[in-house]
């Protein structure tokens, strides 16, 4: 079971994202602000609308945690430079989130890179 951080400012959408994560057999972790240094997660679903959300994503990406962005807007340069595992434009079908999350979690980001 993976731990998936949910960083979404809208309560109704956050609840839906948590439901999808649970349905896939993973543990949703709600992000309510604060320090991420001691937060251990395997992936994150983030709405990158505010600078603080991008900082959360930047912190997680620095630890090689895969990040999926969800937004009503097309991806901006700030979001794309973080190399998200996926960028889903709202509204999107839930199966798109399921597939993107499963793909992100299937990659062992902590394994050493293959050489040769």
Functional labels for PLM-detected ranges:
Residues 9, 70-74, 91:
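Conserved active-site segment of CheY-like receiver
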Residues 55, 72-88:
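Alpha4 helix (beta4-alpha4-beta5 surface) of REC/receiver domains from two-component response regulators
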């Amino acid at each position: 079971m993976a731990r998936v951080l949910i960083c979404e400012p809208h309560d109704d959408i956050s609840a839906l994202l948590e439901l999808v994560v649970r349905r896939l057999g993973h543990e949703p972790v709600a992000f309510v602000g604060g320090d991420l240094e001691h937060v251990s997660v395997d992936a994150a679903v983030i709405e990158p609308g505010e600078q603080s959300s991008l900082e959360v994503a930047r912190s997680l990406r620095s630890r090689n945690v895969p990040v999926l962005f969800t937004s009503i807007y097309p991806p901006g340069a700030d979001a794309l430079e973080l190399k998200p595992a996926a960028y889903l434009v709202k509204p999107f079908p839930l199966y798109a989130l399921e597939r993107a999350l499963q793909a992100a979690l299937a990659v062992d980001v902590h394994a050493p890179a293959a050489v040769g």
